[in-house]
Amino acid sequence: RDVVKKPDGTLAWQPKAINNPEQMLSIAQHISKPTNEVCMRCHVGSGGGMNFKRGDIETAHAGADRDFDVHMGSNMQCIQCHKFKDHQVVGAGTQMSGKDLPEARGQCENCHKGRLHAKAENDRHGKRVYCTTCHITVFAQHDRTDMRRDWSQAEAVAGEGRFEPKIEFQKDVKPVYTWWNGTGEIALLNEAVRVGPNGKVGMYVPNGSRKDPKARIYAFKYHTAKLPIDTTTGMLIPIQVGPVFKTGKI
């Protein structure tokens, strides 16, 4: 990609081949299903750096063995579980309020069916406790993950000539657990924020309870941040990360 200046003076990324019809044709003629390597080019570094965002998709997954990740260590491909239909993906992360295919969900049970445990008691637990709650006890085992961002403070990044918000990292993080039915409440920019019982604003709050028959106990990465709020409207103030990276100020 190249950085180009738009008519209004702002800068934007532009594919190198956009003004090269022959190269664009070649790209169009060499489309194939994405491999793990292709998926990881974006998802490993989402959120600003390696393993920053989710904490469970790390650089080490590229050459993982079965002890590190039983699926990728068995040479499975991402798209075997994260399936697509007409370029729409099945399922969504817990931080997403919208879904391409709301009626379809990616679940462990899509492959793992029938009696799965030596003890029937464990299978009964599976009706209310999701698989990853027990089978993935920690995350960020290789690369540290972003657990808190303070946008009121900016720190210079050594050797890069830019700033970024103050970030607290952790490794070998134990998830937090709560009931979830697959839906949640998300904070929107055009609505006043809602302060929860813990005194904090929930950017995404999972829906579900013990009394909800559709809910199970899931493991979550609990990320916190310090964000600006308009004291008059009670709304979140959108952050333009470009100026923050350049000046260290919101």
Predicted regions and their residues:
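C-type cytochrome heme-c attachment and multiheme electron-transfer modules
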Residues: 1-250
